[in-house]
């Protein structure tokens, strides 16, 4: 077994152990401490553990109303875009590898990431011709990490515990297996973005980013930069209207 794969399996085991402590905790302080530790572990691992936490937070939104569910939803919501980002230098190296040229020949500037996901992170940048763009760059080595995750889905199910109400883990597992290539190939995501933009072209209240074709690759998705709100803000604002 490769060293990276072994390390990730050990991380899965630690995460499962933390999840077990969360399920067994009968003291609120212990439960909250275990929950925060679990969220931190999921965020650091990225890949499917973080994606599982993201899906769990959305699932819990449909079960709000009791304290345990609300607290769990608030904790797991951090995983939707607040994992520790890779250093800017690492992201630039990945961009240069994907584009086959120095980043200075493409961009005027690029900012450190403030928007991270389970498979990649987003940077705000300005192209040489002055366009503000969103650059989504895939984490280096994430494909191998996800393949390791797929082999250990039993451990990945541990965080669900008593919080899995309304969340169909078996169906989610099948979705991941069926759509793995789409998850990891940003050219396919770009195609979906183009199609969605075409379908909604006449919607005045909907803005769909435009793909920058010449800079989009399997590992990098570049689109126009559009300002917006987080999902939590949207839900909160809609609920008050």
PLM feature spans:
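Broad phosphate/nucleotide-binding scaffolds in NTP-utilizing and phosphate-metabolizing enzymes
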Residues: 1-241
């Amino acid at each position: 077994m490769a060293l990276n794969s072994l390390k990730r399996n050990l991380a899965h085991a630690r995460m499962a152990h933390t999840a077990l402590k969360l399920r067994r905790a009968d003291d609120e302080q212990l439960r909250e401490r275990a929950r925060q530790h679990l969220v931190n572990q999921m965020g650091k691992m990225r890949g499917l553990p973080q994606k599982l936490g993201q899906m769990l937070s959305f699932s819990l939104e449909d079960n709000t109303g009791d304290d345990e569910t609300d607290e769990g939803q608030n904790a797991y919501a951090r995983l939707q875009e607040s994992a520790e980002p890779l250093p800017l230098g690492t992201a630039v190296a990945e961009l240069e590898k994907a584009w086959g040229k120095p980043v200075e020949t493409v961009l005027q500037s690029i900012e450190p990431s403030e928007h991270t996901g389970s498979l990649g992170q987003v940077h705000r940048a300005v192209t040489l011709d002055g366009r503000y763009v969103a650059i989504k760059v895939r984490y280096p080595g994430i494909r191998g990490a996800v393949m390791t995750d797929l082999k250990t889905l039993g451990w990945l199910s541990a965080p669900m515990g008593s919080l899995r109400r309304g969340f169909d883990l078996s169906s989610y597992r099948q979705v991941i297996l069926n759509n793995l290539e789409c998850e990891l190939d940003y050219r396919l995501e770009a195609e979906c973005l183009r199609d969605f933009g075409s379908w909604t072209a006449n919607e005045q209240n909907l803005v769909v980013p435009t793909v920058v074709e010449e800079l989009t690759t399997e590992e990098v998705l570049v689109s126009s930069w559009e300002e917006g709100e987080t999902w939590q803000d949207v839900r909160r604002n809609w609920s008050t209207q």
